[in-house]
Amino acid sequence: MQYEAYQWGQSHPTSTSGSMLQDTPTAASQPVKRHAACDECRKRKLKCSGEISGCSRCIKQSLSCHYSVQKQMGRPPKKRLREDNDDISLLNIPDNDPWANSQIAHVPDFGAAIADVSEEPQILSSTHLSPYSFPYRLSTDEDHRHTWQLAPNESMSSIPATTTPWPDFSSVSAAAPKPFIMPPGLTPPIMPSTDSSPDQECSCLSYLYLCLSHLSSLKPFPISQHTICSLYISAKTAQSVIRCQSCPNRFDTGLQNVMFTGTLLNVIADSWLRVSRAEACELGNQVAPPAYAAKMNRSPDLRGAWNDYLRQLVRFSVIRGPMDIDAQTPCAQQAPSVLDLVEEMEARQRRWHESPDSHPLPPDQRLNIPSDQNCLNRDEQDLLCIRVAKSARNVIAKFGFQSDEYPESVPSLSPDSSISP
C-alpha cells in the first residue's frame, strides 16, 4: 500500500498543509514502549509471563507488578529539545494568534491515553501467549485439591494471589489419563508404564528437572502457601520417580535417577528448613484450614499458638511427626514425608545391589567376578548411591527434633548419627 512507506506523524504528499498540525499530537499519542518483563522478574533475572494486570509470578507472591518504560536506545541527541513555543514558531504561528489558540483548544487531551497505556496489549512481547490460554491450578483452594481448571472468560484480577501455572508432577508413573483437560495444541507427556522393556522411554528425568527448576525459582520470593504446596507436589513426584520400573533397566537412566532424586530430596529438606524459620502468623493464616485458622486467631497467645502450628507443620512434613487432625490439609496427608522418601530410596538402592541383574554389563562381559561378589558385602558408607540417599538425613538433623517427636518406629536423627556424604 502507498501509506506503508510513511511512518506515523508524517504527512502524505496528497495531504494539505493544514494536516501538519494534526499529525503532531498523533505522534505524541503513540503508546510508550515498556519492558516485556516486570521490574520484580528483571531484578531477579527470572522469566516473566508478561500479563498486563500482573505477571503470574508477582500474583502468586503478592508483589507489586510494574513494567518500567524502556529507555531510548542509541546515543542521546546532541541538541536540546525544542520547547513548545519553538514548535509553534516553526509553523510561523505567533503565540497571540487567535487562530492558533482556537485550533489548539480543539486538540483532544492525549494525557489520559498515555496514562492508560498500561492497559493496552501492545506492551506485551509477541513471544508471550495469552494468559488465559494456560491452565492454572488453585493453590488457595480450601481443600488443597490442586485440580487443573481453565478460565477463558475470567480476568486475572479474579484469580487468587497464590495461583500457580505449573503442573502436578506427582503422576509421573500413572498409567491412567490426566484428570484435567489439556489446552488446544498441547499433548500430554509420555508416562513410563510398568513394561520392563529395555527400550521403554522414561520421562522421570524431565519431571525431576522441572521440580528442581521450579523450587529454585521460588527461592528469591518469601515463603507462602504456594511454596508449601510446591514442596508437597515435589515430594509426590520424588516418590513416583523412586518407584519407577523403567529407570533401573538401563545404566544411564538408573544413574540419573539416583543422582537427581538425591538432589531433589536435599532441596526439599533444605526448603522445609527455610520454612521453619518463616513468620508463623502470616504463613499459618495462608496454609491452615480456615476453621483452624479462626480458632488459632482467637487464642490469647497468638504468636505462641502459630509458632506451635508451624512446628507441627514442619515436623509432620519432614518426619511425619504428630500434628493436629484439624490442622492437616489433604495435600499434606497425601504427600510423603522427607524421611519416608529417604528410607524408601535407601531400601530401593539395597535391592538394586542385592539383585544380580543390577550390573551394567551382561554376565559374559564382566571382568573380576569375585570382586563383584565382594561389592555386595561392602559397608554401605562405601556405596555412592546409599550416601546420596543418606545425604538428606544431614539436613533433617538440622531441624533439632527431639526423640519424642519422631514416630515410634523411626529412630531420632542427630548430626552425629547421620552419615556424611
UniProtKB/Swiss-Prot annotation:
Biased composition (Basic and acidic residues): 346-357
GO MF assignments: DNA binding; DNA-binding transcription factor activity, RNA polymerase II-specific; zinc ion binding
Record feature DNA-binding region, as residue ranges: 38-65
Subcellular location: Nucleus
Record's GO cellular component terms: nucleus
BP terms from Gene Ontology: positive regulation of transcription by RNA polymerase II
PROSITE patterns listed in its UniProt record: ZN2_CY6_FUNGAL_1, ZN2_CY6_FUNGAL_2
UniProt xrefs under Pfam families: Zn_clus
Span list, region Disordered: 1-29, 346-371
Annotated keywords: DNA-binding, Nucleus, Transcription, Transcription regulation
Deletion phenotype: Abolishes growth in the presence of gliotoxin. Leads to reduced growth in the presence of the oxidative stress-inducing compounds allyl alcohol, t-butyl hydroperoxide, but not menadione.
Bias-annotated ranges (Polar residues): 8-29
CDD domains in the cross-refs: GAL4
Gene3D superfamilies with a match to the protein in the record: Zn(2)-C6 fungal-type DNA-binding domain
Tagged with keyword Transmembrane helix: no
Protein's job: Transcription factor that is important for oxidative stress resistance and essential for gliotoxin (GT) self-protection through the regulation of a gene encoding a putative gliT homolog, even if E.nidulans does not produce gliotoxin itself.
Protein name per the record: Transcription factor rglT
Species of provenance: Emericella nidulans (strain FGSC A4 / ATCC 38163 / CBS 112.46 / NRRL 194 / M139)
Protein's gene: rglT
